[in-house]
Every structure is written in structure tokens, then in C-alpha cells.
């Protein structure tokens, strides 16, 4: 049974329990991942294929998925699924197009020029979980902003199914989004191949996409060798409501995240004891009809809660401290809380903006900071796939005008060679 508490300070213990979820990992995971990374670095594709046979499928039909197989999904797939994905792509593209940045240049009468270049990364690796729980939406949410950013090549890795073939829904999404290459491999070995490069898999500049604890650990260990999107923790949702909320909707939304895994967190903060009580009833009722009932029950019992707040302002304060991945506001005037909620991955406003709307269709990215990191991290965006560099051009006159200040600061820092680099030019 989901716990019910009042917002009297006791919620702090709940926050500590939620934060501890990330420490609940096997102590041997990092050791195992390090061994896999070293093996792939030394032995390349041979090691990747060996681990694929061991962990995923002993008889993988191919390593690199042929381009014809990818394109064939466009005609072989369920037309309704194709149309649904195209509608999602349209919305995601429209939203992310607004994020695109341009470089700039500044000059003045002295002839100096300073500016910034913005350009897409050369190659990006996209990890997509495979198997029966495959998510084509992950392809959309990662590949679309990368394409808009100007990334030259997207290399996707995804584990094979047990019969040695790729998941067709994943291939369909890859075809629709213009992914350049697809390899059938997964786990830490696939992440290592993208980071180091092999004979067949290109070395990339950045790796994005969700995965299990082995994938997340590999990304963490390889950060610095390659850039990554973020270290994603278990999924989480926080719902804020007043007395106008429909408990049926609230319960459905809490369970939509609780079903992800047993470490998922689902919390309701409400000003209404009626909403709290009726939500408990709805949770019990709706849970019986859902396929992942056991997972939902476990996550709600261990990392779920209903918190009764004095008012919506207190509810917002608690939300900012928790900094959730997903935050729903179901209240009489939900839009008035936008400016009060600073620490959140994605904000869903009103009775008819449930979290799954953002997972697939609305347009904003569903790759979001978790585990309280929304205090300082942002969702995946076009900006995640660009690099910026500055440039400086000074004329002789412009340098002479600046020389005295530069030399003074350099000598104060006792960097006399810095000062000398300026002085030899202005003395000519």
C-alpha cells in the first residue's frame, strides 16, 4: 500500500529513500564493465561479437544491419504505426527547430573581430534498448535533435532479438529519422565500441540513449573519452494537485511511471484529503487491469507516497526540493505555477496533459534529468549535439589600444611570457 503522510517535515525521510535508489546496484557491475571495456578496446569487433553471442543471441543474423533491411520496414510495417510515428516526428521536429542556434560576429571601428561558431558534432552514437521491450520513441527523441543540430553521421546500436534479428519497430524509427548506420549489439560492449571505435563501428564524439545499469556504468566510465548525454537513474513522477483534480487521472499517471521498473518513484502532493483518499482507491482498482501490476505495486510501496500539503505554495516548495524528472500540475489554474516551479525536467500542466503525452507526441524531449539533477541539468536538446568555438581577430591598432591592460594583468599574475607576447608586438 502506498504510504500517506503530511507535509510536516516527515517527507524529508521519503526524499532520502528516493535518493538512495541509485546506490542499489550490484557491487560487481563496475568491475565487470571495466573488463568489457578493456576487452573491446584491445580486440574490437571480435570482442563485441563474442559478448553479443554470450549475452543476447548465439546466432546473430548480421552485425551491421543492411541498408535494404532498414528501408524495407517503411513498406512492411503497419501503416497505422508509420502514420503515428510520422505525426510524432512532425511535433518533435517543430519543437526542436526552435532550439537551433546560429553563430555570431562582433566588430568595431578599430577593425577587431570576435565571434562564435556553432556546428553539429561529426558523429554521434545512439544506444537503443532492444529485445521485447523496445522503444522506437527513444530513436525519435535522440535522432531528431541530432539531425537538426547538423550531426554528420548517426550510428545506432541495438541488441538483437533472441532469434538473431533486429527489432523491426526500432528499424522503422531509424529509417524515418534518417539514422545512417545500425549495428546489432548492446550492453557495455556496444558503448565501448562507439567510444573507442572498431574495424566496423566508427568512433563517435558523443553517446546518447537509455540502457540498463551496465550501459549506464559504461557511459559513466567512458565520459571524457567521449561525451555522453547524462547518467539516467530510475524514472520518477511527481503530481501536484488541488481539490479540482480527478483522482482517476492522478492514479493512472502515477502508475504510468511506476510500471517502468521496481526502482521507479511516483509521488502525489495534494492539498485535498479527498483527492488523496480517492486516489488510493483508484490505484487499487486500476492496477488490477495492468500487465505490469507486480512492478507497479513494488515501486509504489517502496518509492511512492501521497503527501498532504497545506496549500499549493508549500507543494511547489517541496517539488523544487525534490527536482523531479516529470512534474504534473493538475489544478484550477495550472499555468500560474510555471514561474514557481524551477527544478523540473519536464512540466505537464492541466487535466489533459498527462506524462505519456510528452513521452511520445507533444514535441519536447523525453530524455530528462533524474534523481534530483533537474536542479542543474537540462533535458536533451539540439544544444546537446553541437560544439561551439570562439574566434578572435585584432588589427595592430586594436592590439595597441588593449596592450597596456593585458600586460598589467599578465604581470600581476606573474606570467611574464604572456606579457612579453603582447609587448614584442606593440614595440614594433
Which residue ranges define each predicted feature?
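N-terminal Rossmann-like NAD(P)+-binding subdomain of aldehyde/semialdehyde dehydrogenases
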Residues: 1-122
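Conserved small-residue-rich beta-alpha loop and adjacent elements
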Residues: 106-172
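Alpha-helix C-terminal capping segments
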Residues: 141-152, 175-177, 195-201, 219-221, ...
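Short internal beta-strands
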Residues: 152-162, 266-273, 279, 350
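Conserved NAD(P)+-binding/catalytic subdomain of aldehyde/semialdehyde dehydrogenases
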Residues: 178-249, 253-256, 260-265
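A conserved active-site cap/scaffold subdomain adjacent to cofactor or substrate pockets
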Residues: 230-302, 306
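C-terminal core of ALDH-fold dehydrogenases
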Residues: 320-428
Amino acid at each position: 500500500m502506498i504510504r500517506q503522510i503530511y507535509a510536516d517535515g516527515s517527507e524529508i525521510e521519503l526524499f532520502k529513500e528516493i535518493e538512495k535508489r541509485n546506490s542499489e546496484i550490484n557491487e560487481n557491475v563496475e568491475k565487470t564493465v571495466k573488463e568489457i571495456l578493456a576487452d573491446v578496446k584491445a580486440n574490437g569487433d571480435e570482442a563485441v561479437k563474442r559478448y553479443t553471442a554470450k549475452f543476447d543471441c548465439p546466432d546473430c543474423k548480421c552485425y551491421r544491419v543492411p541498408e535494404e533491411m532498414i528501408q524495407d520496414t517503411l513498406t512492411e510495417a503497419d501503416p497505422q504505426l508509420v502514420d503515428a510515428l510520422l505525426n510524432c516526428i512532425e511535433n518533435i521536429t517543430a519543437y526542436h527547430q526552435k532550439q537551433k542556434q546560429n553563430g555570431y560576429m562582433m566588430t568595431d571601428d578599430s577593425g577587431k573581430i570576435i565571434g562564435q561558431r556553432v556546428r553539429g558534432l561529426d558523429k554521434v552514437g545512439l544506444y537503443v534498448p532492444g529485445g521485447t521491450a523496445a522503444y522506437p520513441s527513444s530513436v525519435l527523441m535522440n535522432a531528431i535533435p541530432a539531425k537538426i543540430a547538423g550531426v554528420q553521421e548517426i550510428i545506432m546500436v541495438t541488441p538483437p532479438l533472441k532469434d538473431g534479428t533486429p527489432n523491426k519497430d526500432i528499424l522503422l524509427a531509424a529509417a524515418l529519422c534518417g539514422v545512417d548506420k545500425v549495428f546489432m549489439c548492446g550492453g557495455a560492449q556496444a558503448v565501448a565500441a562507439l567510444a573507442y571505435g572498431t574495424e566496423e563501428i566508427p568512433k563517435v564524439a558523443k553517446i546518447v540513449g537509455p540502457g540498463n545499469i551496465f550501459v549506464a556504468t559504461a557511459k559513466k566510465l567512458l565520459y571524457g573519452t567521449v561525451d555522453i548525454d547524462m547518467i539516467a537513474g530510475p524514472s520518477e513522477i511527481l503530481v501536484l494537485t488541488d481539490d479540482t483534480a480527478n483522482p482517476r487521472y492522478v492514479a493512472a499517471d502515477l502508475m504510468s511511471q511506476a510500471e517502468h521498473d521496481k526502482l521507479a518513484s511516483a509521488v502525489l502532493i495534494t492539498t485535498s484529503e479527498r483527492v488523496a483518499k480517492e486516489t488510493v482507491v483508484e490505484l487499487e482498482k486500476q492496477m488490477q487491469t495492468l500487465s505490469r501490476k507486480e512492478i507497479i505495486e513494488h515501486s509504489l510501496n517502496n518509492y511512492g507516497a501521497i503527501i498532504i500539503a497545506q496549500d499549493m505554495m508549500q507543494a511547489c516548495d517541496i517539488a523544487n526540493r525534490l527536482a523531479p524528472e516529470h512534474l504534473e500540475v493538475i489544478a484550477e489554474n495550472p499555468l500560474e505555477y510555471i514561474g514557481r516551479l524551477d527544478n523540473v525536467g519536464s512540466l505537464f500542466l492541466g487535466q489533459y496533459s498527462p506524462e505519456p503525452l510528452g513521452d511520445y507526441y507533444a514535441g519536447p524531449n523525453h530524455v530528462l534529468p533524474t534523481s534530483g539533477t533537474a536542479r542543474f541539468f537540462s533535458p536533451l536538446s539540439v544544444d546537446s549535439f553541437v560544439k561551439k568555438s570562439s574566434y578572435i581577430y585584432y588589427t595592430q591598432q586594436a592590439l595597441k589600444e588593449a596592450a597596456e591592460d593585458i600586460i598589467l594583468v599578465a604581470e600581476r599574475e606573474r606570467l611574464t611570457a604572456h606579457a612579453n607576447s603582447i609587448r614584442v608586438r606593440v614595440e614594433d
